[in-house]
């Protein structure tokens, strides 16, 4: 239990550092976040647990970690949902992020997790911040129950 508390303290310190308003992540911090994210995967946390940690007052997880732990189909649904709501065509979104949809899906699938610096370009193209994006993921996830599966 001691090591788990250390882990949560690291999460808490990280979220305090970013103040839940992250515009960009420097490499050093991203490496730290990725390491914490891998520890989370090892402990077998679920999507619901990550959303809970995002809200909980005592233990918090960074927005980047939450994003990194969501299954790709949920992320893609949220991207499409925001794109349609803002009347952004697939073509203009692809141009903004300098890669086509098939390529960025393949990129995420082959890497197994989100490359945050690449994903920032998608958020910019959608003109939405990461917290709002995660809220959309939560809405979609809650609307569909647990039907969304990875892969």
Segments from the language model and where they lie:
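DNA-contacting interfaces and partner/effector-binding or oligomerization modules
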Residues: 1-20
